[in-house]
């Protein structure tokens, strides 16, 4: 990347900008924007985004195209949202420099199937994934501040149907953690089908949220 590059990165389910604290090492190398509108990580009790149609509308109205190269990226479900964003931009004749999918299921794995998510199931999922400390989940404010945004994201994810999205004309870099217990390595291979351009696979260790342990060298490698 160069100093004029902008990275627009989408957080994992229920997470916000703090999920990308490790990217602070990129200061001076690139500009980083975390995409966290209502329902995508803000903890201010706004109505959540629960359908992909709402997400598309929100993205179109809120995103200003930067000058210079634009890299789209996302972690876990955020990788799918970065792919949706690439489709939106291409429909408007705007092409990103690269898409970086970090430990995310491939677009074809999103089939628009209803899974019956509710607050209790969302809370159980948060406990099993381990991204949110149990002490926070047990607090009185946890439902409104943490569980509800996660539920919004889960409902948003189940409204996605990858077969309805076109193959993008942007190079894809796929980061796969070989010790990821949530997303299999086969998903990384299937990302190859999501682009008509070049595909690059980077294998790392550190589990599903391996990006949290990245330093400057690792981040620059995945964005190069």
Predicted segment positions?
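Active-site nucleophile loop of the alpha/beta-hydrolase fold
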Residues: 37, 98-110, 129-131
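Active-site loop/oxyanion-hole signature of alpha/beta-hydrolase fold enzymes
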Residues: 34, 38-68
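Catalytic histidine-centered segment of alpha/beta-hydrolase-like enzymes
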Residues: 201-217
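Gly/Ala-rich beta-loop-alpha elbow adjacent to hydrolase catalytic centers
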Residues: 74-78, 82
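Short beta-strand/loop motif that positions the catalytic acidic residue
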Residues: 168, 174-176, 180
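Active-site nucleophile elbow and catalytic-triad environment of alpha/beta-hydrolase enzymes
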Residues: 147-165
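Conserved alpha/beta-hydrolase "acid-adjacent" motif
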Residues: 181-187
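Short, surface-exposed "cap/lid" segments of acyl-processing enzymes
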Residues: 1-40
């Amino acid at each position: 990347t160069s100093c004029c590059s902008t990275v627009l990165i989408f957080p994992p389910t229920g997470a916000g900008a703090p999920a990308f604290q490790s990217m602070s090492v990129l200061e001076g190398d690139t500009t980083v924007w975390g995409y966290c509108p209502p329902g995508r990580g803000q903890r201010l009790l706004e109505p959540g985004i629960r359908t992909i149609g709402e997400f598309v509308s929100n993205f179109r109205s809120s995103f200003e195209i930067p000058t210079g190269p634009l890299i789209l990226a996302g972690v876990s479900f955020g990788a799918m949202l970065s792919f949706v964003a690439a489709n939106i931009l291409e429909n408007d004749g705007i092409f990103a420099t690269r898409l970086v999918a970090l430990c995310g299921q491939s677009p074809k794995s999103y089939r628009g199937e209803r899974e019956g998510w509710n607050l209790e199931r969302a809370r159980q999922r948060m406990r099993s994934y381990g991204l949110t400390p149990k002490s926070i989940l047990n607090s009185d404010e946890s439902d409104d501040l943490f569980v509800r945004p996660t539920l919004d994201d889960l409902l948003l994810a189940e409204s996605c149907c990858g077969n309805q999205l076109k193959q993008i004309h942007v190079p894809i870099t796929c980061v796969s953690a070989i010790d990821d217990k949530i997303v299999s390595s086969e998903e990384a291979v299937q990302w190859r089908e999501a682009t008509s351009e070049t595909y690059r696979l980077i294998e790392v260790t550190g589990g599903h949220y391996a990006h949290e342990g990245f330093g400057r060298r690792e981040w620059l490698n995945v964005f190069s």
